Amino acid sequence: KKDGYLVNKYTGCKVNCYKLGENKFCNRE
């Protein structure tokens, strides 16, 4: 399951998350 794997790039940051296809992306606030 790949969902959320990109979230790890922002560990320790406050993020806004959204799903796009099979991947979960987060943007730093």
From Swiss-Prot:
InterPro entries: LCN-type_CS_alpha_beta_dom, Scorpion_toxin-like_sf. Residues 2-29 form the LCN-type CS-alpha/beta domain. One of its GO terms (cellular component) is extracellular region. The keyword Ribosomal protein does not apply. Expressed by the venom gland. GO terms for molecular function: ion channel inhibitor activity; sodium channel regulator activity; toxin activity. Its main location: secreted. Belongs to the long (4 C-C) scorpion toxin superfamily. Sodium channel inhibitor family. Beta subfamily. Binds to sodium channels (Nav) and shift the voltage of activation toward more negative potentials. This toxin is active on crustaceans. Has the structural arrangement of an alpha-helix connected to antiparallel beta-sheets by disulfide bonds (CS-alpha/beta). This is Toxin II.9. It comes from Centruroides limpidus (Mexican scorpion). The lineage of its organism: Eukaryota, Metazoa, Ecdysozoa, Arthropoda, Chelicerata.
